Every structure is written in C-alpha cells, then in structure tokens.
C-alpha cells in the first residue's frame, strides 16, 4: 500500500490548513448534513513519482494545559505506531512551547523519520527566517520554513517528505488488489465491535486474540481459509498498541488501520455494534471504502444483545440507510459473532460482492442499455444543446469502471450521472462502487477550439 505520512502538532499551528494545501483542495468536510458526518482527514498525494497518503491528526478535546500536553503526546505516539513519515508542525510566530518540546522529545527517541515544519512564516525575509531558528534546538534536524496559508515552502516540504519515505515496494501504487483468484476481505470497524470475534467465528477456531479492551489487536492479522471451494484471505485490521498513556485517540486511528489494509482487499466488512447507533467513525470507515472503490458489506454485530425482533431489525436498517446513504448500495446484515448466528451469511454475501467487484459487461449489451436509458429518460440540455450519448464501454474492473463518450463531457449533471449509475446497478445487479468517466469524441476539443471566435488585438 501507499506509505502513510502523519501531520502532527499542537492546536492552532495550522495542521488542517497545511493538509488542505498539500493535497491541493479543501476536503475537511465532504458532507454537510446534520447527524453522522464524514469528516475526511486523509488524502492521496504524488510527488516525484512517489504516491503516498497524508493523515491529518487534528481534533483535540479542549482542556487545561496538562490535558493538552497529554493529548499531543498521544497523538505523536499513535503517529509513530501507524505511519511511515511524520510532519511535525510548529508555529514560528508563537515560538517554542512545552507541548512542542514534549512531542519533539518523543519523536526523537522513536527513530521515526520526521520533517520539522515551522509554519506561519508569511515571507522569506531574514527576520521571519530567524523566527524559525529556535526550533533547531529540538534536535530533529533541519527546519522547513513555510506558510500553509500562502503556499510558501510547499515544494521543499514535499521534497523532504519523499526523501524520508521507505523504499518503494512492488505493487505499491496499484489501484486494485491482485487478481489471483483469492478473495481478500478486510474486517474493519471501531474498537471493541467484535472484529476478532467475527474472524474467529468464520475460521471456527480462536486464532485472533479477542478482548473487551479496545485496541487489543496489535497488528493486521491475515488468516487464510477455503470456503465452498473458494480461497479467502481475512484481514483483521490493526488496533492501536495500547499504552498506559493512550486513552483518547484509539477511535480516530482506527481509520488509519483500515486504510492500511483497504487497498489490498476486494471487500470491506464494516462491523458495527447493535447496541449503539451509527456514529461519525462508522461513517468515516464506510466513506473510506467508497472513496477507495472497494465493495462494502455492513454487518451489525452483537444482535443477540438487543433481541431478534424483526421490527426492531427493520427500524435499525432504515436508520442505517439514512445515516450511511452515500453507500446505499451496500448490503446490511445482522449477526452475532459470539454465538455464530448468521456468520456464514456474512461470508456468502462478501463472496458475492467480490465477484461483482471484478464484474465485466459485454460492450454490445452496454450500448443497448445506453440506448434504452436515453429513450426512457432523455439527456438534458447542456449549453443550449441536447446532451448526446454516443457510446459506452467498460474500461476496468475492481471496481467496475465505464467510459461514456458524449458531446459535452464536463457538462453531465450529477442527477443524470446518478440515473446512469442506478440503471447499471439494476441491470447487472451490482452492489459495489461504480465509476463513470465521461469523455469527448476524438478530436472534439480541437474542433470546438476552431469554432470559438478569435479575439482581435488592438490596431
């Protein structure tokens, strides 16, 4: 998988501003709705031929100075445990603080590659550069002076990050897991929802340590089995190495753990706790599967603790569909990993989704469907002309990806995109992510450029 780069630092040093600047767009909030949110704190980047993923570790709970120090230390510890390179952000205007020194001390002892960034330097004058000088005392090497707000020093920061990445691994940049006949399932979820118990129930043996203490799974655990003549690989996502000083941030970094195994999996099995409603963390993990283009099955565990009443189950299902409507295509199952109830159903559905994940449709059938879609629901008017759909073809699987040739590739309304996606789902019974790419006909851009009136210069 792609290397992970954590952005750490105390509050108000500009971590989120730097994160948005580095990934080139503002993505702190990707869904503005009440209730469950999908705050996204990770994004892919590429520099000098290397792809990697930035993690923004923001989100502190207000408290006194002692609590703040504790939270900053926890943040640094979790970043060291989970990530390959750490960008330690400080505020050059405010100068060194006790929190900065506490984090630096821990990072220095860890031996993890660190880029020390002195933020909020809004120009390159000697006086401003001097403000960053005191941070050399932290013993973390060169200080990268920058201004996240104004975009100064970004190229140098990228260079520093890439220089500290681990050696590139074979298949590191692959967008899809290997197509070798093995179905790869990532068991993801918040701490203490029963991930290890589910794996043990599927394996019918106690191979993974299961405990009521959140964060007892220390590393991703791969387990192989043969199920109905199919080879499966189950990965129980890593929990957090539980240390006495880590108390508050286990949930946040379960996203990082899921990120680590998602890219080498076909299907994400999102485990939830039946005794609790869906929370932000569940939405983040579901959103991660959608954004990474992985098949997703939502499994509500511990159903034995709330009763098997069918009406209650349907009420919970409808609540989930509302909370997680951005993955409305994903099946929702109810199980008890502890008792083994409906565990085989989870594997059956996950196996079906893995096949759909690699589905390929015949081109003639696709184009007959396209004609049918346009006949039933004519394309809208774009820039004063009808939107014309000429041709559709599948260009990739894992997930199914289709290109549609049109006369206005950048003018297709979102509503019509959803219509096409839903028709593809209905026709081919696809309950996995679908990607659509709209493109113009060959030479279309040149023809349109020739049609544009030429501006006349002054005579």
Swiss-Prot record:
Which sites bind GTP 1? 9-16, 56-60, 119-122
- Please give the InterPro entries that the UniProt record associates with this protein: AAA+_ATPase (IPR003593), G_ENGA (IPR031166), GTP-bd (IPR006073), GTPase_Der (IPR016484), KH_dom-like (IPR032859), KH_dom-like_a/b (IPR015946), P-loop_NTPase (IPR027417), Small_GTP-bd (IPR005225)
Any GO BP: ribosome biogenesis
Positions binding GTP 2 in this chain are: 189-196, 236-240, 301-304
Q: Span of the secretion signal? A: none
> What Gene Ontology molecular function terms does this protein carry?
ATP hydrolysis activity; GTP binding; ribosome binding
Similarity remark: Belongs to the TRAFAC class TrmE-Era-EngA-EngB-Septin-like GTPase superfamily. EngA (Der) GTPase family.
> What's the protein here called?
GTPase Der
């Amino acid at each position: 998988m792609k290397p992970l780069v954590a952005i750490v630092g105390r509050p108000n040093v500009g971590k989120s501003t730097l994160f948005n600047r580095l990934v080139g767009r503002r993505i702190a909030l990707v869904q503005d709705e009440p209730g469950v949110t999908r705050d996204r704190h990770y994004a892919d980047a590429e520099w000098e031929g290397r792809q990697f993923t930035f993690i923004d570790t923001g989100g502190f709970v207000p408290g006194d100075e002692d609590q703040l120090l504790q939270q900053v230390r926890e943040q640094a510890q979790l970043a060291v445990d989970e990530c390959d390179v750490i960008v330690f952000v400080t505020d050059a205007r405010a100068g060194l603080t006790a929190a900065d020194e506490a984090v630096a001390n821990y990072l220095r002892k860890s031996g993890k590659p660190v880029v020390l960034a002195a933020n909020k330097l809004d120009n390159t004058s000697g006086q401003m550069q001097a403000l960053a000088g005191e941070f050399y005392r932290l013993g973390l090497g060169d200080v990268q002076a920058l201004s996240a707000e104004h975009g100064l020093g970004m190229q140098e920061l990228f260079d520093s990050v890439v220089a500290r990445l681990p050696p590139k691994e074979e298949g590191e940049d692959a967008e899809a897991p290997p197509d070798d006949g093995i179905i790869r399932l990532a068991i993801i979820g918040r701490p203490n929802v029963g991930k290890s118990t589910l794996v043990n129930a599927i394996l019918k043996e106690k191979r993974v340590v299961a405990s009521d203490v959140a964060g007892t799974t220390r590393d991703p655990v791969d387990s192989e089995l043969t199920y109905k003549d199919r080879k499966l690989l189950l990965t129980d996502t890593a929990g957090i190495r539980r240390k006495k000083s880590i108390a508050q941030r286990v949930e946040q970094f379960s996203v990082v753990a899921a990120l680590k195994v998602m890219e080498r999996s076909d299907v994400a099995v999102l485990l939830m706790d039946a005794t609790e409603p869906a929370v932000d963390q569940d939405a983040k993990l579901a959103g991660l599967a959608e954004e990474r283009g992985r098949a997703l099955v939502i499994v509500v565990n511990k159903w034995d603790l709330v009763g098997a009443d069918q009406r209650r189950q349907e009420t919970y299902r409808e609540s989930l569909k509302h909370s997680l409507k951005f993955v409305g295509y994903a099946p929702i199952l109810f199980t008890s990993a502890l008792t083994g109830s409906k565990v085989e159903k989870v594997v059956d559905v996950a196996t079906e989704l893995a096949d759909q994940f690699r589905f390929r449709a015949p081109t003639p059938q696709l184009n007959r469907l396209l004609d049918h879609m346009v006949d039933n629901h004519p394309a809208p008017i774009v820039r004063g002309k009808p939107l014309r759909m000429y041709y559709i073809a599948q260009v990739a699987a894992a997930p199914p990806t289709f290109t549609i040739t049109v006369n206005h590739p950048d003018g297709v309304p979102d509503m019509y995109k959803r219509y096409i996606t839903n028709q593809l789902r209905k026709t081919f019974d696809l309950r996995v992510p679908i990607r659509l790419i709209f493109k113009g006909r060959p030479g279309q851009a040149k023809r349109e450029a020739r049609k544009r009136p030429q501006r006349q210069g002054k005579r």
